[in-house]
Every structure is written in C-alpha cells, then in structure tokens.
Amino acid sequence: MRVSKLKLPLEALFENANFILTAVSPYYEYREGEKTEHLLGYKYEVVEDGNFERFSVKVPSIKPIITAEMLEKSSSRIFVTFEDAFGRIYQTPVGSLEISFSAVSAKLLEA
C-alpha cells in the first residue's frame, strides 16, 4: 500500500469542520513544470477555529465563494466549511512528509 494513495477525511483530522478564511487565490494547471493560463480552481487558506492550525484547501471551481478584495474589506471573521474534503500525504523533494487538502466545494457560513 502506498501512503500517497491514502485519503484522509478532513473531519477525521479536525474536531470542528468550520474554519476561519484568511486568503483566497487562484491555482493553475502546470505542464512539464511550467505554469499555464488554464485556471483549475481556487485555493482557500484557512485557520482552524480551535487550535489555530493553518492550511489551505484547493477547490476546483471557476468562481470563488468570495473574492480576495471582499475578504480584505471585511471587518469581521469569515467562516467557511468544505464539502467532501480530504487530505493526501506526499513527500517533498527534501524528503519530509506534508499533507495537501482538496474538496469538492467550499461554502460561506453565517457569522
């Protein structure tokens, strides 16, 4: 069994499935190590509401749930949750293990 094939549900890793949104940015397709102009989706940088663990979740969507400008202008915390979110373990070029997260969709929560 390969560790990279494991899918870890987000709910199994974090007590609370609601996260504080800190940033939104697009992510693009790469071909042969080169970034293309083909938009694959948006990356949501979040912080866990309990122990303040920081991580990002990629969502394959051509439209973000909130723009970076709207997030920046907000005077209060913005909370999000993710549908069918999971993490995958991968090894970096220097040999350390990391987890990348992705989800089917993201949803804004009422404050």
Locate each region found by the language model.
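OB-fold and OB-like single-stranded nucleic-acid-recognition modules
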Residues: 1-111
